[in-house]
């Protein structure tokens, strides 16, 4: 017999019958007779928010994840009451809510069932902390697949997996390890060629189960807070990802140099070592734009200080590096050393800016400097103070970017590796414990850092990178996948992680090339470089405890492969820049898993390795040693082997030969790929032509090229160049139409168009309806034309 009252009532609780409802504007509220309220808000015809409370009223509606600058609106909304349910209809979907228990189901307008509750919303009282453990379970359809969730070191398709979201410092993590550094509680479901998304905007520790515990049930739950989630309808995965990215926000355009190659190590010091590294890059003609300084540049690991023994004149050093094309990036951690003679600590203490325990004393934890206090970045006053601390680094010394690390937050020598859960946070006027603030701590640090860097680097654009992040962090920062390991398994993990981050809204992501922990072989490093140059963020980083990891740390062959692939990245910078422009303008991910590219082809649903880089390039890394090629899946359509220009029909798995200095790369037929000449750093060269590689296709295709001044904010005033190419290929004819938008005039005056795969001999060329003189013999030999920029239509006729 149970006599303990708490135990007697412990267990799952459920909404009871609906007793009333109200419809006001874009929101409909349903009230049950046991005080549960479900508030349904229609943000768009395909974006619906579901918010539950069990106490008869809602707490303050606040989210760090949602981009409040986005305007929402729907085209159609109708609410009707039926005998057993309510129906909410938009121009895209209809939602039925049962009167008996608030369980809901969502259909398209053809009555196809997209998603339905199993148990639906339920909860359990949290007797240890107060509040509720909130839960949701959904029925899963046969063959349903699941994607997203950000930084997860597991298969692309999450079917059969259970994952945990709690930002954690996981040094040398392994495949399937949970949790990791980032928290992105957003997933994409796909069944019967229909995609939808769920974003569970809850910053407490959350869990997702994709049919692991029960075969046909998907569930998600949190240790506290509200059951507050957004449903996003596709039906294409592209629509789901774009809508979610709009909801949580997009970054501003980075300066072009940020898309170059970066070199980092824990740590490069003293100054002579830094210059030795940068000089070697220039000597070997391996392009590089950024050099990083890890924690050893500081005085006793105190943030915003310099070790003058290692770096006696940092301003002079940074200026000299800049003359050679290197931008200096420095690390800044959240732990502020407890030292009464340290000016940052003095200010934080004087102004009461550090996090406190529940009963009053400051949160104290050991990090690199020893005992530290930690700023409460959830307080806007503290964020403003933190932003101001960057003045000397950026304005005076000339540092170009900041790297935030250890901001999960990580604390050494404690069992849970982070703050105690009783630490209090301001949470922008919604005071709470660390249970609620933990997952957004790193994002708010990155936010404060971003505003500081942006303020002092102006009129140039800022660059910030963070290890820990929550949904929406992409508005302020790039990221990397944390302390990985120099193993072939981690090369496989890195490939999937960056793809997954890309479709989870955080596209500006890369991995530590070569692995942070342990030491790669030359072969592994070369294969990682070959993958890493196709990631949005491209940086080699390693632990100094495990040997050297510069390209020349191996042999001449690895040096040559590194030069070849980094040079290729620099050639593709206009293509990369265009990818980024489409990401910030339209929410289109820069990397596209094959399932995103073609969800109707079931062969793509379980592919991990292959991905689309931008819109037109297919990449498949080599992920095992001693490989002379690999099997890979070429998606449906027509493609050209980048290295051989051989034509390939997709929709099938094929063997592709691949030498050590190559990986399988294919270009979509009909595409135009823009290229710059190889530069050792962005801005090194002036050039008078843009190379355009055109890959012939019978039919139509679109390609785009975005350019601007490569830094600064004139692009926001219309001073950009956006070229839209439309190609029409026929058996003996090719038409290239060009439309330009924007007021920016590129410094080059010509296009060099390389024609690949032309099936006919060219006999006539017209530009804007005027025939031009050209040498058929030379064209036959070289297959290119040099034309003045600014044409509207290029017409090529053959026989």
PLM segments and residue spans:
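Aromatic- and carboxylate-enriched substrate-binding clefts and catalytic-loop regions
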Residues: 55, 63-65, 116, 287-562, ...
């Amino acid at each position: 017999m149970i006599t303990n009252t708490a135990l007697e009532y412990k267990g799952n609780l459920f909404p009871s019958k609906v007793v009333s409802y109200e419809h006001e504007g874009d929101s409909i509220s349903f009230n049950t007779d046991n005080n549960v309220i479900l508030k349904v808000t229609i943000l768009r015809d395909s974006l619906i928010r579901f918010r539950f409370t069990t106490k008869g009223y809602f707490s303050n509606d606040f989210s760090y994840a949602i981009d409040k600058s986005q305007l929402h609106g729907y085209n159609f909304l109708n609410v009707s009451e039926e005998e057993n349910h309510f129906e909410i209809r938009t121009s895209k979907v209809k939602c039925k809510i049962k009167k008996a228990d608030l369980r809901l189901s969502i259909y398209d307008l053809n009555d196809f069932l997209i998603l339905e509750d199993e148990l639906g919303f339920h909860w359990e009282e949290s007797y240890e902390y107060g509040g509720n453990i909130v839960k949701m379970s959904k029925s899963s359809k046969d063959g349903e697949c699941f994607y997203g969730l950000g930084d997860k070191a597991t298969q692309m398709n999450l079917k059969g997996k259970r994952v945990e979201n709690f930002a954690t410092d996981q040094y040398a993590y392994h495949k399937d390890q949970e949790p990791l550094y980032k928290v992105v509680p957003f997933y994409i479901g796909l069944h019967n060629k229909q995609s939808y998304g769920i974003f569970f905007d809850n910053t407490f520790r959350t869990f997702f189960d994709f049919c692991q515990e029960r075969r046909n049930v998907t569930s998600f739950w949190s240790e506290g807070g509200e059951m507050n989630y957004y449903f996003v309808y596709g039906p294409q995965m592209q629509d789901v990802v774009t809508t979610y990215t709009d909801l949580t926000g997009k970054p501003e355009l980075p300066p072009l140099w940020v898309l170059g190659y970066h070199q980092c190590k824990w740590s490069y010091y003293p100054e002579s070592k830094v210059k030795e590294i940068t000089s070697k890059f220039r000597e070997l003609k391996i392009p590089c734009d950024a050099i990083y300084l890890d924690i050893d540049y500081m005085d006793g690991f105190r943030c915003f200080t310099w070790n003058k023994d290692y770096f006696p004149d940092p301003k002079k050093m940074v200026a000299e590096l800049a003359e050679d094309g290197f931008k200096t990036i420095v690390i800044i951690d959240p732990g502020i050393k407890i030292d009464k003679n340290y000016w940052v600590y003095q200010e934080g203490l004087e102004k009461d800016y550090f996090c406190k325990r529940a009963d009053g004393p400051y949160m104290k934890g050991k990090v690199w400097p020893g005992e530290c206090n930690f700023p409460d970045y959830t307080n806007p006053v503290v964020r403003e103070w933190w932003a101001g601390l960057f003045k000397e680094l950026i304005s005076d010394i000339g540092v170009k970017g900041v790297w935030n690390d250890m901001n999960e937050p990580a604390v050494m020598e404690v069992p849970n590796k982070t703050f105690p859960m009783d630490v209090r946070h301001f949470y922008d006027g919604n005071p709470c414990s660390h249970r609620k603030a933990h997952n957004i701590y790193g994002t708010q640090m990155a936010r404060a850092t971003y505003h500081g860097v942006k303020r002092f680097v102006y009129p140039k654009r800022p660059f910030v990178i963070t290890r820990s992040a929550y949904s929406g962090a992409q508005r302020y920062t790039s990221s990397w996948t944390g302390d990985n390991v120099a193993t072939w398994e981690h090369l496989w993990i890195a490939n999937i992680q960056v793809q997954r981050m890309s479709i989870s809204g955080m596209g500006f992501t890369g991995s530590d090339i070569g692995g942070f922990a342990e030491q790669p072989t030359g072969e592994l490093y070369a294969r990682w470089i070959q993958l890493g140059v196709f990631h949005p963020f491209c940086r080699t980083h390693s632990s100094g405890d495990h040997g050297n990891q510069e390209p020349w740390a191996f042999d001449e062959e690895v040096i040559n492969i590194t030069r070849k692939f980094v040079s290729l990245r620099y050639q593709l910078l206009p293509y990369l820049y265009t990818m980024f422009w489409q990401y910030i303008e339209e929410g289109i991910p820069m990397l596209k898993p094959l399932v995103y590219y073609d969800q109707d082809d079931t062969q793509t649903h379980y592919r991990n390795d292959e991905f689309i880089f931008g819109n037109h390039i297919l990449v498949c890394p080599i992920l095992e040693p001693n490989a002379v090629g690999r099997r890979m899946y070429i998606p449906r359509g027509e493609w050209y082997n980048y290295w051989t220009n051989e034509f390939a029909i997709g929709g099938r798995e094929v063997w592709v030969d691949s030498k050590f200095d190559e990986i399988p790369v294919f270009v979509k037929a009909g595409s135009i790929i823009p290229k710059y000449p190889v530069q050792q750093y962005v801005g090194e060269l002036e050039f008078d032509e843009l190379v355009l590689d055109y890959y012939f296709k019978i039919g139509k295709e679109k390609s785009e090229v975005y350019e601007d001044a490569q830094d600064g904010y004139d692009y926001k005033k219309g001073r950009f160049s956006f070229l839209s190419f439309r190609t029409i290929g026929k058996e003996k004819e090719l038409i290239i139409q060009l439309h330009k938008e924007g007021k920016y005039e590129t410094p080059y005056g010509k296009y060099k168009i390389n024609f690949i795969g032309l099936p006919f001999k060219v006999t006539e060329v017209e530009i804007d309806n005027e025939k031009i003189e050209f040498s058929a013999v030379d064209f036959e030999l070289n297959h290119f034309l040099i034309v003045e920029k600014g044409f509207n239509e290029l017409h090529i006729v053959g026989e």
